[in-house]
Amino acid sequence: MASIATTAAPQQGRGATTAGWIISGIVILFLATDGLIKLVPLQPVTDTMRALGWPTNPLSLRLLGVLILGPTLLYAWRRTALVGAILLTAFLGGAVAAQLRMGAPLLSHTLFGVYLGALLWIGLYFREPRLRALLR
């Protein structure tokens, strides 16, 4: 493990790093919006949570919002991006399971968490040389 930390990261063009930040920015924007609308329990959020079979009291919604925003902030900050990506992957797995349990449409609803998770990791791969070094 120590050799990975001391190994020089592979060089990459500025365009790929920029693309990684753009992809990550889209993911961060989506997840931050999702978390923020749960902090202020709007009626559409409450209705969706009820349809999914989750508690709809404001405290539960705010807790869920914090559970989304925390890892999203970790993902946005370079030093903790890997930890944030792992936590968000776990969260998105739970979202996929909830959609699957409800019998939601497969390609548009159920697999949306998979699509978002793939973008999350692709963005991190392009913007984080240490992750590229680890995977080579």
PLM regions and their residue ranges:
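Membrane-interface extramembranous regions
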Residues: 2-136
